[in-house]
Amino acid sequence: MSAQNLPYAPAQLAADLRALGVAPGGVVMLHASVKAVGPVLGGPNTILQSLFDVLAPSGTLLMYAGWQDLPDFLAELSPEAQAHYSAHHPPFDPATARAVRDNSVLAEFLRTWPGTRRSENPEASMVARGAQAESLTRDHPLDYGYGVGSPLARLVAARGQVLLLGSPLDRVTLLHHAESLARLRHKNVIHYTCPFLRDGRTVWLPIEDLDTGDPHDAYTFEEIVGAYLALGRGRRGRVGDANTVLLDAADLTTFAVAWLEARFGPDQ
């Protein structure tokens, strides 16, 4: 709530974002909690619009979307259940497939915003709006969707930033890119199939990736980001009511790779 005990106006959020270091022309990957920001005139749309306004005219906003209905668990099912899914599960459609709910409602708001582009890797799908949206999301590899050639790699190459808008430190999806680059003693490779529409029919294509959900070694993303911030890197502030952190994507990736290899590299 603002100092006047009123919902935040768009201009107030924009001023907070500028004070933190979000600037015109920037490429920003957002992780956000709408609830943490507090009451806002216009709700979630206003939060996104405030970011668009600050980044304009040549900036870009990026978010992780994924696919809420990703059928990556078929190998765990009975043959009968697998056959049922294979015959009837709708294919991945970048235009309509819902964003994963657990990350932020804003991902679905951004996915459906006019002018937004979406990458075509179902599990690692990203949505972006702005001047570099097309270049960030096009030709997303199906295999190793957080690695080389991914939207995350392009975020780093664009000297982009990661904005944690009331979001906890363990939500930094960019660190999956660091995991893919790091030389680690344990890298679990997983295989699954996913339905796509090809020439008017559903085709199940094989996908290979690192297991991003269950690392062998005991570490958390919160540890990595916390260690980075403890060195005085990154910027902290408030946007609305939300404790907010702004991170340099390239610098954080370099730090995270070194942090991981020092503790879990092949020689450790």
Listing of model-derived features with the role each one plays in the protein:
Residues 2-15:
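N- or domain-start disorder-to-order transition segments that initiate the globular core
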Residues 14, 21-77:
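N-terminal active-site beta-alpha-beta segment that forms phosphate/nucleotide-binding
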Residues 65, 164-168:
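Short, structured patches in soluble enzyme cores that scaffold and shape functional sites
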Residues 68-70, 125-128, 169-172:
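Short, catalytically relevant binding-site loops at active-site mouths
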Residues 74-165:
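Internal, conserved structured core segments that host functional sites
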Residues 121-122, 166-167, 173-179:
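A short secondary-structure junction signal
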Residues 180-206:
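Gly/Ser/Thr-rich active-site loops/lids in small-molecule metabolic enzymes
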Residues 199-268:
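Acidic/aromatic/glycine-rich contiguous surface patches that form carbohydrate-binding/processing clefts
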